[in-house]
Amino acid sequence: MTTEAKCPFNHAVVGTGTTNRDWWPKQLRVDLLSQHSSKSNPLDPSFNYADAFKHLDLQALKQDLHALMTDSQDWWPADFGHYGPLFVRMAWHSAGTYRIGDGRGGGGRGQQRFAPLNSWPDNVSLDKARRLLWPIKQKYGQAISWADLMILTGNVALESMGLKTFGFAGGREDTWEPDQDLYWGRETKWLGGDERYSRGSPGVDEAHGVLVKDDDSQVPHTRDLENPLAAVQMGLIYVNPEGPDGNPDPIASARDIRDTFARMAMNDEETVALIAGGHTFGKTHGAGPADYVGAEPEAGELESQGFGWHNRYGSGKGADTITSGLEVTWTTTPAQWSNDYFDHLFGFEWELSKSPAGAHQWVAKNADAIIPDAHDASRKHRPTMLTTDLALRFDPAYEAISRRFQQHPEQFADAFARAWFKLTHRDMGPRARYLGADVPAEELVWQDPVPAVDHALVDAQDAAALKQTILASGLSVAHLVSTAWASASTFRGSDKRGGANGARIRLAPQKEWQANQPEQLAKVLATLERIQADFNAAQSGGKKISLADLVVLAGNAAVEHAAQAAGHQVTVPFAPGRTDASQEQTDVESFAVLEPVADGFRNFAKRRYAVPAEALLIDKAQLLTLTAPELTVLVGGLRVLGANVGDSKHGVFTSRPGVLSNDFFANLLDMRTEWKATSEAKEVFEGRDRSTGELRWTGTRVDLVFGSNSILRAVAEVYASADAQEKFVHDFVAAWTKVMQLDRFDLA
């Protein structure tokens, strides 16, 4: 027998071979609800990052980072003798993947360490930045996460180059594997944009920099960027620096910039400040053709040890570096904060040129060589700019802001510091999550602030009395449950926004959302506000209950009442301490993105979408940080409690609505029922008695998926079993409480 024949794996290893996804590419991604489990986390179960960070010597760490900025290493020498610009780019590209549409992306979980981000064409050379940081990360260990360290290093870099930053907050916990829920687009080639736009760049077969072939740029992409994406091409953080699809058109580039930055929650002033501030520092790298650059880290060899983009041009580093394919240095002070950027932008006329790598860029006409070389003090260069820089001059709105910043450097510095803080903290959620001595005192509207608790809180006896009053008010179980759910389920685990705290369900825009049934909502809130006013007026010692707390307590009361009707005595946990935000504390435009276009928990969809309803349900559950069992038990419970929008009977598989029973599962899995679609759209289905043809139930895709999908059916079978009624009630209460408290970071 040969050695090859003896091998038990026959060249195959665990996890390879044809997968379920290969056979059924449209299979529902229930697995997204089990990512980032404790099984991938090497830290002890008792480890608490917030506690560890509180014991961190933050000032000592910052001193070490300051020292690193000018400690140039031979294996990756610092441009201009200062690593600051490289670390600013690292932090920017960590935070800059955030998009407001679904709150995903950003720097909050240290995902730049993993694929695909660690190998994106736009992140060339950031593997070197993280390796430069490793000795410091190694020194401080788990007291500082990679997620926090990358952002903090960007802050320290700015400070070391003369900018007064707005502040820094820690609190970003690392994850230990790539995010699977993030939708980066459907393109299969780097730098492609032909799926996210109805017409866009087809991308390139091999792209180790952001350079796009000129023949791809003759027909710029359309303006219909797919939601929730913010980047214009696969593998870019924002926009193509050469212009749309490599077309060097500053006006067209401005349109891309405005769309992309708006999708990151930035207005025009913040956009100008960020671009100009970032480009005050450092340079781009395009010393030679991109053909000299090797494979990205994820495609690298073992001996590369996670390094990618091996450069065979010259020394492969320093003056020979190839990153983007562009070769631009914007200012005479590339390692020092200044107003040079605007002085150059408006002080010169610009002509189109090519970098040594062949990328479109702009050079100042008839200008002297005044720009320092990054590695040779005896050399100077003419000023250069990117197409995206000229957009700030030739777009009228951007130009007005840029000229104001040129005339008022103090406004520019403040605007950049604030925009940088927003960029690097936008995905952290409320200030209650902020840690450290450098947290700024100023409260900002984009942080979705809520007032501090300034009164005594209700106790268990008060809560019990209030629940009795609520149940006697004439409000139905269905209305109480649906209102509490509408308030709490706006939460997004992606950027920690939304939730019941603040009672913003009574404010614009939430009070007008279709899913919240404005007319019904107004009646429920009016009744609860009367109960709140009566209770608060009767108290002494300053005790009060907020409407935010009362909405949740009312939902709890309804759940307890429904459980009692099913024969189970339960007390739903309740933690007072929510407060009521004002309309002035609520950015209507910012909150508009939280509106549910579909909520399968309430059997709601604003319209029919290309994405199947059951996939939107998984997306909603993932944003709510739910597991597959939690998703299942909540849908089953909410159906029998009557929480559907518009009092729809779809999925209400029970003869006793308002009773917290497992009827949804028992009846869905009843083999006496045969299901058929009511139309070719297959959105609504009828369940008829197999023998008589009598109509028994109607349901939607988000109902029938619990009998169709093998994973969800396995869970549904547990709750449909004869011995599951008590377990169902207790599991529903636990999952309900989790959702009601998702935004209660103060409880941690």
Curated annotation (Swiss-Prot):
Cofactor note: Binds 1 heme b (iron(II)-protoporphyrin IX) group per dimer.
InterPro entries reported for this sequence: Catalase_peroxidase, Haem_peroxidase, Haem_peroxidase_sf, Peroxidases_AS, Peroxidases_heam-ligand_BS
Active site: H93 (proton acceptor)
Residues carrying the site annotation Transition state stabilizer: R89
Catalysed reactions, semicolon-separated: H2O2 + AH2 = A + 2 H2O; 2 H2O2 = O2 + 2 H2O
One GO CC annotation: cytosol
Cross-referenced Pfam families: peroxidase
Modified how: Formation of the three residue Trp-Tyr-Met cross-link is important for the catalase, but not the peroxidase activity of the enzyme.
Classification via Gene3D superfamilies: 1.10.520.10, Peroxidase, domain 2 (1.10.420.10)
A GO biological process held by the record: hydrogen peroxide catabolic process
Keywords linked to the UniProt accession: Heme, Hydrogen peroxide, Iron, Metal-binding, Oxidoreductase, Peroxidase
Enzyme class: oxidoreductase
Similarity comment: family membership: Belongs to the peroxidase family. Peroxidase/catalase subfamily.
Family matches, as NCBIfam families: cat_per_HPI, PRK15061.1
Free-text function comment from the UniProt entry: Bifunctional enzyme with both catalase and broad-spectrum peroxidase activity.
Quaternary organization: Homodimer or homotetramer.
Protein known as: Catalase-peroxidase
Organism: Xanthomonas axonopodis pv. citri (strain 306)
